[in-house]
């Protein structure tokens, strides 16, 4: 039987009028009472018709871009600013405002601040700030949101996310190196929990494992922080092997810059003795010596796509789309060109 407002009031030991005021976020109700009532609503899986109606018809003319500001590396990467530019271009066309908000998945006030308050019509969410409970609650309320980047876990059929086709990119990089005559391909990635790095690694492994004379690729895989220092350290580890790799795919161009420096410090010629390919073309890849072959990721267009899909959800045009991807473009430069 469907849960009613009477059930909520009884379970919370408050009056029906108090529940109604909580639904309307009335300032006369204490935050403690609001949180208590909302927790019971969630527990009893109650979707108030008033919220559903207001979410559908009342517009704040504002969408949120939710990031975890604890992840400082995200803000050092130009990827973030290009992505924002794409999102803002679509938001502007719809005469909406784009609000950047700091949140992490440990913030218990997430739903109160952004959903029940009706301050936003929809959200673009970085995977690092989302967990399964929040995703389920947003779906239950039919609140429009799009995850920008591959989620760490399966949130369910109704959840939509957009990303670069990182798996295809890993395969493109590996195939390019093979075409150039390299045979011992290595991979420098970020931490194992990072779904982006994992997808890029999977694309690389799909190609390497299919080789007629397959090598043990696990010996040529190193994972760590995605920065220059770790790129330098991981590349040196590989070069210390009895049979070192003759080429390497880097998860981003910060790691590639570290790998290139490691080779240079050892007097290893690139591309003669070591081929290097990186994900991300900007900012370092075109300006190193030699210039690094890169998988160019159109992050501006990724921001455009994510925001267009979000507005489709807000306007209830295509709510069922679960995954959209953009294929990277391989830009061949001196670091891997043998032919």
What do the predicted segments below correspond to?
Residues 15, 61, 121, 182-185, ...:
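Short acidic/polar active-site loop segments enriched in Thr and Asp
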Residues 58, 62-175, 238-240:
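Alpha-helical recognition/docking segments in bacterial nutrient-uptake
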């Amino acid at each position: 039987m469907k849960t009613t407002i009477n059930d909520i009031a009884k379970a919370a030991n408050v009056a029906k009028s108090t529940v109604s005021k909580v639904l309307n976020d009335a300032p006369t109700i204490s935050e403690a009472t609001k949180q208590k009532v909302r927790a019971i609503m969630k527990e009893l899986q109650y979707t108030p018709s008033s919220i559903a109606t207001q979410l559908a018809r009342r517009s704040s003319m504002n969408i949120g871009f939710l990031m975890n500001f604890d992840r400082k590396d995200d803000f050092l990467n130009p990827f973030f600013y290009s992505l924002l530019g794409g999102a803002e271009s679509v938001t502007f066309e719809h005469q909406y405002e784009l609000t950047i908000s700091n949140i992490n998945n440990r913030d218990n006030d997430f739903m109160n601040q952004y959903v029940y308050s009706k301050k936003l019509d929809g959200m673009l969410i970085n995977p690092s700030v989302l967990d399964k409970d929040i995703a389920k609650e947003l779906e239950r309320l039919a609140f429009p949101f799009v995850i920008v980047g591959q989620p760490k876990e399966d949130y369910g059929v109704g959840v939509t996310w957009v990303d670069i086709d990182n798996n295809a990119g890993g395969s493109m990089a590996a195939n390019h190196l093979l075409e150039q005559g390299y045979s011992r391909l290595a991979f420098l990635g970020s931490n194992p929990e990072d779904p982006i790095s994992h997808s890029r690694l999977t694309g690389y492994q799909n190609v390497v494992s299919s080789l007629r004379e397959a090598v043990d690729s696990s010996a040529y895989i190193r994972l760590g922080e995605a920065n220059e220092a770790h790129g330098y350290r991981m590349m040196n580890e590989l070069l210390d092997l009895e049979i070192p790799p003759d080429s390497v795919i880097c998860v981003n161009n910060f790691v590639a810059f570290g790998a290139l420096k490691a080779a240079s410090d050892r007097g290893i010629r690139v591309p003669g003795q070591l081929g290097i390919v990186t994900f991300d073309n900007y900012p370092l890849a075109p300006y190193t010596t030699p210039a690094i072959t890169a998988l160019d990721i159109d992050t501006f267009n990724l921001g455009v796509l994510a925001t267009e899909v979000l507005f489709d959800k807000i306007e209830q045009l295509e709510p069922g789309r679960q995954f959209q991807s953009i294929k990277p473009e391989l830009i061949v430069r001196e670091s891997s060109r043998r032919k």
